[in-house]
């Protein structure tokens, strides 16, 4: 069985497979973790706060409207799949994972 890549470019969109660590000391893209992109955020995993904070962080990082980012899988899990349409910026930590 073939594993899916952590970061995948599809036309003008990016699909990220994320391992999320909430309640961290800062918001950051850490790098590759078991074939997923590890991201840490400061928000706790309570009442959707971590998901909302993640979307806000990704919105700022990729310079796209928060409302355009789609949480495709993992609403109640730390393993998430997110679609980012037409990112204006691709951070170095993500760009090195593109094939």
Swiss-Prot record:
Annotated GO CC locations: cytoplasm
Pfam families in the cross-refs: DUF167 (PF02594)
InterPro entries to which the protein is assigned, alphabetical: DUF167, YggU-like_sf
Residues forming coiled coils: none
Gene3D superfamilies named among the record's database cross-references: YggU-like (3.30.1200.10)
Annotated family: Belongs to the UPF0235 family.
PANTHER family: UPF0235 PROTEIN C15ORF40
Annotated protein name in UniProt: UPF0235 protein PM1313
